[in-house]
């Protein structure tokens, strides 16, 4: 074996310096340089083996030397120096390297350095025959340079390598001239030395009990640690200054060399992780494959290390030529900073930018502030205006399209079919559907509590990129372009159906498929009424002509210009509280932001005296508005068990009446309601016949309605923190006072009994005032947002209704994945579930986060 290669193997495992005769061997037979052992004793007041942690009872000076090492070094010194062909430059470099290693060598005093200096220079740095001493490459082709700063060379030139910009570009020197050149133009003769395995601290790691945690290595944020080895799945050993200890892997960010070291020492039982970590690994392999295909591209964030970040920031050698799709996941602060310049994100934590043919999707770090984001593009099969309308104010109604387009619904609902009835003939137009992009409308206002949260305003549109498992959404405001997170139960999905029509009236329909808000541009005033179909059943149906004039929209919600009116279709897995408070109609496009102006649905309870006869007398009232003006029925019948149901009387079909068909289903607190356009005229004999039938039906329905409040309770809201229970309880109590928790009972086949109630609007405002209780709320009371958790995967986690137990944290615990909680000593945790493997699921009282943690770190109180 060559002497230089042998000397490279004889290095201290702690400081990585070459060992000399002063090195000491411990009783466990591990050898270290004397300087490292003295540093350990001075910092910890005891000596433990850095490799196996065995306690050494004697002092450092009393330890024996490694006899085999001493003999090996003596043999190398006594060998004559070989005549090399490295050249004067290589020899001078060897002298400098030998002198540098001589001055920093472990355990040698000054007298030994001076006395044996020349011998060590000769022994340490003999030139190797045929191998150059500097990292260099040989030019395979001529390169003239394409940009200023490129290094020009001819075929056969030897180029000294200075640093590697990325996997496609080098920075080198030839004849005193520095510049950049592509990797595929040269052949690497001697590669650049690998950077030392290092890591950067992302958080502060403090040790409270120095006696119990004496093996831990405390550090502060942004400290640079030298990585020695991986201890187990969650801990690594490293050195900071003259201190050596273990530290949690999740607290640091490794460079490329340290990642390789950690992967080599990885235990066999450790998997790649779940959620986002698996995505990162797959994206890394995809990124490497794309990089091999595009060898002439100058953009790469993969090979940057912390050793060259200063020079990288000076030499801006990147261009944004990225072949879509590619996922850029940067662990280097400089690269993350360059990404953040393009996306407007903070570089305080690693960012991910996904660039594809359909747009730019930015995943900000959890701690990044809410800042302005980029513009977005959408799938080619859906027009821009059909997907979102105009992003920038002032908003105008979209122009008529030759082909009607609808951006469709949730996964559970069938494709919407819009029917236009012209006389006896019926023409059915099937509209194309698309599930992208995910556009949501805010149904509650929300004031942000943290810097990375978005402010929600009623009716404001949002584009959602990710749905976190804790119930929070990550997206951008379509008005301000700000990117952030917001509670998912404060918004509802939106689909927009555009027809070749001009503005008409506004109707309201609610169904029980999924939590969806459908914005529809209806037909012109002269056109026939529309019907919506879903799952084969007609949700909107024109039956009777016995109705009353609708309640008009308040002036604050009506557009001054004849803009396109919007039909608000809310359906879905909503809670009862949301069903009673969140149903609103969208008035038209706002002039300053894309909002849906809404009016709350008030709970109108008909009294026992409201019978079909009284409803018939109200038919003579003319409609208050006509023409293209917008109408809306602002009252929805939610019958109580003690109140008879007023049924409708059928009449001639000369003009349609307002009727509400409440089709209740299990798991849904909403009714499917539709309203024809006009009011009716006189009654006929068919109306009297239906009165008798409805009275019989009413008696049967009253039996079904009795006792419903004790059989069924409102569904709980999305996951919430125990500290927010008071707010939720107050909201539910107020809502029960307003409308009562009455939901129809379940039949034997599992469905809830359905009933048809008439929207008797004899005097809408008087009825609301008469039936309003002191505890009722006519405004929308938003439910509490779910507690924040790191965003890792799509979908939501349902709330656990089991009783909570209070636990106190006795030992701090750093989270090892995004699904785990960070525990600090003294924290209070509300435990929802105890798993068989010893892990608990609970909510942290300090910040309201819900996640998993080991049960051995807490105690019951």
Curated annotation (Swiss-Prot):
EC number: 2.3.2.27
Reaction catalyzed: S-ubiquitinyl-[E2 ubiquitin-conjugating enzyme]-L-cysteine + [acceptor protein]-L-lysine = [E2 ubiquitin-conjugating enzyme]-L-cysteine + N(6)-ubiquitinyl-[acceptor protein]-L-lysine
UniProt subcellular location: Cytoplasm, Perinuclear region; Cell projection, Lamellipodium; Golgi apparatus, trans-Golgi network
Stretches with biased composition (Polar residues): 301-317
Low complexity compositional bias, start-end: 273-285
Pathway field: Protein modification; protein ubiquitination
UniProtKB keywords: Cell projection, Cytoplasm, Golgi apparatus, Metal-binding, Repeat, SH3 domain, Transferase, Ubl conjugation, Ubl conjugation pathway, Zinc, Zinc-finger
Region listing for Disordered, in residue ranges: 268-319, 684-731
One cellular-component annotation, GO: perinuclear region of cytoplasm
GO terms under biological process: neuron migration; positive regulation of JNK cascade; protein autoubiquitination; regulation of CD4-positive, alpha-beta T cell differentiation; regulation of CD8-positive, alpha-beta T cell proliferation
PTM remark: Autoubiquitinated. Ubiquitinated by SH3RF2, leading to proteasome-mediated degradation.
Cross-referenced Gene3D superfamilies: SH3 Domains, Zinc/RING finger domain, C3HC4 (zinc finger)
Pfam families: SH3_1, SH3_9, zf-RING_UBOX
Compositional bias ranges of the Basic and acidic residues kind: 689-700
Domain remarks: The RING finger domain is required for ubiquitin ligase activity and autoubiquitination.
Family in the record: Belongs to the SH3RF family.
Function description: Has E3 ubiquitin-protein ligase activity. In the absence of an external substrate, it can catalyze self-ubiquitination. Acts as a scaffold protein that contributes to the effective activation of the JNK signaling pathway.
Name of this chain's protein: E3 ubiquitin-protein ligase SH3RF1
Taxonomic source organism: Xenopus tropicalis
């Amino acid at each position: 074996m060559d002497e230089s290669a042998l000397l490279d193997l004889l290095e201290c495992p702690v400081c990585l310096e070459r060992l000399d005769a002063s090195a000491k061997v411990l009783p466990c037979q591990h050898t270290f340089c004397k300087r490292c052992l003295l540093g350990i004793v001075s910092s910890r007041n005891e000596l433990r083996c850095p490799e196996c942690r065995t306690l050494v009872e004697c002092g450092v000076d009393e330890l024996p030397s490694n006899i085999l090492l001493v003999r090996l070094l003596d043999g190398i010194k006594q060998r004559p120096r070989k005549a090399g062909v490295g050249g004067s430059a290589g020899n001078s470099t060897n002298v400098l390297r030998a002198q540098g290693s001589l001055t920093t060598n472990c355990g040698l005093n000054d007298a030994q350095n001076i006395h044996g200096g020349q011998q060590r220079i000769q022994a340490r740095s003999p030139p190797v025959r045929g191998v150059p001493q500097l990292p260099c490459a040989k030019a395979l082709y001529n390169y003239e340079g394409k940009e200023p700063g490129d290094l020009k060379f001819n075929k056969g030139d030897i180029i000294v390598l200075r640093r590697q910009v990325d996997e496609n570009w080098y920075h080198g020197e030839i004849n005193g001239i520095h510049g950049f050149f592509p990797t595929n133009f040269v052949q690497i003769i001697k590669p650049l030395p690998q950077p030392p395995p290092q890591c950067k601290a992302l958080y502060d790691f403090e040790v409270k009990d120095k006696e119990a945690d004496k093996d831990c290595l405390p550090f502060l944020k942004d400290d640079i640690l030298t990585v020695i080895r991986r201890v187990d799945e969650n801990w690594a050993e490293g050195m900071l200054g003259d201190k050596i200890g273990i530290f949690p892997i999740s607290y640091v960010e490794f460079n490329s060399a340290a990642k390789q070291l950690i992967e080599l020492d990885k235990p066999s039982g450790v998997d790649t992780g779940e959620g986002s970590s698996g995505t990162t690994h797959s994206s890394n392999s995809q990124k490497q494959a794309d990089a091999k295909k595009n060898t002439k591209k100058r953009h790469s964030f993969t090979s940057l290390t912390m050793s060259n970040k200063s020079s990288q920031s000076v030499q801006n050698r990147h261009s944004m030529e990225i072949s879509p799709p590619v996922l850029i996941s940067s662990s280097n602060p400089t690269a993350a900073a360059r990404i953040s310049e393009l996306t407007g994100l903070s570089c305080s934590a690693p960012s991910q930018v996904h660039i594809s043919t359909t747009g730019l999707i930015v995943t900000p770090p959890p701690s990044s502030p809410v800042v302005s984001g980029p513009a977005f593009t959408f799938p080619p099969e859906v027009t821009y205006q059909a997907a979102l309308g105009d992003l920038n104010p002032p908003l105008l109604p979209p122009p008529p399209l030759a082909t009607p387009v609808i951006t469709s619904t949730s996964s559970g609902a069938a494709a919407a079919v819009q029917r236009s009835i012209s006389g006896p003939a019926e023409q059915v137009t099937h509209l194309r559907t698309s599930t992208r992009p995910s556009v949501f409308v805010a149904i509650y206002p929300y004031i942000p509590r943290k810097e990375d949260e978005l402010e929600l305003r009623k009716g404001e549109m949002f584009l959602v990129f990710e749905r976190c498992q804790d119930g929070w959404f990550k997206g951008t405001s379509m008005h301000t372009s700000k990117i952030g997170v917001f509670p998912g139960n404060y918004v509802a999905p939106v689909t927009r159906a555009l027809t070749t029509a001009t503005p008409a009236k506004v109707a309201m329909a609610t169904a029980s498929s999924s939590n969806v808000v459908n914005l529809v541009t209806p037909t012109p005033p002269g056109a026939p009424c529309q019907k919506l179909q879903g799952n084969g059943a007609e949700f909107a149906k024109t039956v009777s002509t016995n109705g009353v004039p609708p309640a008009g929209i308040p002036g604050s919600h009506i557009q001054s210009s004849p803009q396109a009116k919007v039909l608000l279709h809310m359906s879905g897995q909503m809670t009862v509280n949301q069903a009673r408070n969140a149903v609103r109609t969208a008035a038209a496009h706002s002039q300053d932001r894309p909002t849906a102006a809404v009016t709350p649905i008030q709970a109108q309870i008909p009294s026992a005296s409201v019978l079909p006869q009284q409803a018939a007398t109200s038919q003579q009232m003319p409609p208050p508005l006509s023409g293209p003006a917008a109408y809306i029925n602002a009252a929805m019948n939610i019958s109580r068990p003690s109140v008879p149901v007023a049924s409708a009387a059928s009449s001639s079909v000369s003009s349609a009446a307002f009727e509400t068909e409440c089709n209740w289903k299990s798991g849904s607190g909403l009714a499917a309601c539709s309203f024809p356009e006009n009011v009716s005229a006189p009654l006929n004999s068919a109306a009297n016949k239906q009165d008798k039938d409805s009275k019989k039906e009413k008696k049967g329905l009253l039996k079904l309605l009795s006792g419903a409040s004790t059989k069924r309770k409102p569904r709980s809201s999305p996951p919430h923190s125990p500290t927010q229970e008071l707010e939720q309880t107050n909201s539910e109590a107020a809502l029960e006072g307003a409308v009562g928790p009455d939901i129809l009972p379940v039949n034997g086949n599992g469905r809830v009994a359905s009933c048809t109630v008439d929207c008797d609007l004899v005097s809408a405002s008087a009825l609301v005032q008469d039936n309003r209780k002191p505890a009722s709320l006519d405004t929308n009371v938003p439910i509490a947002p779910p507690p924040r958790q790191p965003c890792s995967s799509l979908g939501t986690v349902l709330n656990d209704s089991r009783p909570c137990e209070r636990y106190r944290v006795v030992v701090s615990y750093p989270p090892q994945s995004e699904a785990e909680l960070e525990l600090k000593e003294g924290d209070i945790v509300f435990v929802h579930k105890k798993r068989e493997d010893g892990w608990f699921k609970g909510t942290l009282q300090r910040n309201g986060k819900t996640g998993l943690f080991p049960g051995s770190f807490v105690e019951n109180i």
